[in-house]
C-alpha cells in the first residue's frame, strides 16, 4: 500500500497521515526527516546533501529521489509507505515513476482557502510546552492564556493570515498541478485517486479513508 497525500497546508494531512500509519502499520516518509537521517548517518548521499545545505542551496530532485529509493527499500516499507510532502512538482512525480516507485493511492484533501485561513490563523501556541489551542475549535479556559501555567499564548508567524495566504498561493501555483497529473495517471489505471472533503470532522475523514484503503 503505497500512498501519497495531497492538499494545502492546514488541510488536515498530518492528522490523517497519523491515522493511516497507525491503522495500517506503514511508515510515514518525510523528505525532511530522510535528509536529516542521511546526514546524521554520514551516508554518501547524506554528505552530498549536507554540502549543498551548508551552502544554502536546495537539494536537487535526483538526490532526493535517490534517498526516497533507498528509504522505501528498507524492511519497514515491505507492506507499503506513506509519502509526506513529496512529490511537490511534476518533474519529481515523473522521477519517482522513472525509478520504478509506483503509487497505489493518491488521496487529496479538499478544503476551501477561507476555511484553511480560519483554521490556521485561529491557532494559539504555548511556546514552552508546545500545547496548541484554537480560538474556535479548542479555546483555552481563559482567553490567550495557557490552561496549565496561565502563561501567554502566541500566534506563530506561520499562522498569521497573510503568511497562510502566501503559502496557499505557492500551493496553488505548484503542487495543485499534481492533482491533474495524478488524476490523469488514475484515468490510465496507474493509480487510484480519491478526493476527500477535508471540511468534515476528523473522525468522518478517517472513516472514509478506512473504507477506501481497507
Swiss-Prot record:
Catalytic activity: AMP + ATP = 2 ADP
Predominant location: cytoplasm
Function according to Swiss-Prot or TrEMBL: Catalyzes the reversible transfer of the terminal phosphate group between ATP and AMP. Plays an important role in cellular energy homeostasis and in adenine nucleotide metabolism.
Annotated pathway: Purine metabolism; AMP biosynthesis via salvage pathway; AMP from ADP: step 1/1
Subcellular location: Cytoplasm
Protein name: Adenylate kinase
Subunit structure, as described in the record: Monomer.
Protein's GO biological process: AMP salvage
Region (NMP): 30-59
Assigned EC number: 2.7.4.3
Positions contributing to ATP binding: 10-15, 123, 132-133, 200
Chain spans, region LID: 122-159
Membrane-crossing segments per the record: none
Coiled-coil zones: none
Keywords: ATP-binding, Cytoplasm, Kinase, Nucleotide biosynthesis, Nucleotide-binding, Transferase
Sequence similarity: Belongs to the adenylate kinase family.
Note on domains (UniProt): Consists of three domains, a large central CORE domain and two small peripheral domains, NMPbind and LID, which undergo movements during catalysis. The LID domain closes over the site of phosphoryl transfer upon ATP binding. Assembling and dissambling the active center during each catalytic cycle provides an effective means to prevent ATP hydrolysis.
A molecular function (GO) term: ATP binding
GO cellular component: cytoplasm
